[in-house]
């Protein structure tokens, strides 16, 4: 699959929709459209998901999302999905999406502990996610230990290692 971010880097959400719709219509690639909880009501997020479904998009990467520019911490939008697990449940009500969620081999920076972070991942899986995609990491052993910890928690969905491609060899 090809992961397509949601309004990242200053692009619009409409541009993201156009991109994934074109991937479905014009290529043999399977797009995984990112969808976040940030800055929108449930109805607005649900409408985006319905448009993805109507365009033939069947794979969503459901993320809480980062705080908006200028904000130091995440605050749920009034009337919006509070967390990724809520978004996963909402998406499952709309369609039988394949849903990927974020995972953190080195623990999410806002997590109270590594164990609490795994509990949160388990809730996202139990809500209906079919796969986890990790943040990037630098040591392969970190990923292998993470997989072992996931299995010990009863998390048995595929876990895809996130990679950060080198885009500037001089850096």
What residue ranges belong to the model's regions?
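Short, acidic/polar
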Residues: 16, 42-50, 112-123
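Active-site mouth loops of central-metabolism enzymes
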Residues: 31-43, 98-116
